[in-house]
UniProtKB/Swiss-Prot annotation:
Known catalytic reactions: peroxynitrite = nitrate
UniProt GO MF annotations: heme binding; metal ion binding; peroxynitrite isomerase activity
UniProt protein name: Peroxynitrite isomerase 1
The EC number(s) this enzyme carries: 5.99.-.-
Biological source species: Rhodococcus jostii (strain RHA1)
Function: Heme-binding protein able to scavenge peroxynitrite and to protect free L-tyrosine against peroxynitrite-mediated nitration, by acting as a peroxynitrite isomerase that converts peroxynitrite to nitrate. Therefore, this protein likely plays a role in peroxynitrite sensing and in the detoxification of reactive nitrogen and oxygen species (RNS and ROS, respectively). Is able to bind nitric oxide (NO) in vitro, but may act as a sensor of peroxynitrite levels in vivo.
Lineage per the UniProt record: Bacteria, Bacillati, Actinomycetota, Actinomycetes, Mycobacteriales
Amino acid sequence: MDENSTLSPAHSDAAASSSANTPPLPYVPSALAPFAGLWRGEGEGAYPTIDDFAYTEEIEFAPTGKPFLAYRSRTREAGSGRPLHSESGFLRLVGEDEAELLVAQPTGFTEIHRGQVREGTIELSMVVLSASPDAKPVHSIRRQLSVRGGDLTYDLWMAHDLTPLTHHLHGHLRRD
């Protein structure tokens, strides 16, 4: 293990009790380790062009054995359980304390964000937003992720068509 890596918190107990015949569990860069694991919780959404809404969410940042985590998010409408949004990608370390989030959405978008990792928080600024010809006219996205104890919170801002960058989503999840 190098000085920038550690076991994911979700895997540290299992690694301590593994036998010599069990392959080692994937390592996670220490700056990303607080994010590793499965998270479940709730969120709220608002935007000037739509009605406010509430949702449940499951997010996973899964160790891969490389200096990045596989990312997956699935949301459902609160109450009915109807599927809403999903996205997947990778959270990777690109410097000692700089992370990059790569996201693909089935709505026709791919995003690349970069930001500093500081005390369990990543402020992510958009580097690239690509859209398929049929995707909605989203012009900019900004994200913030924070881990405090067993809680993951995030916020997302979006600029869409003629609406400037506006707070759109807030989620609060607990480590599963």
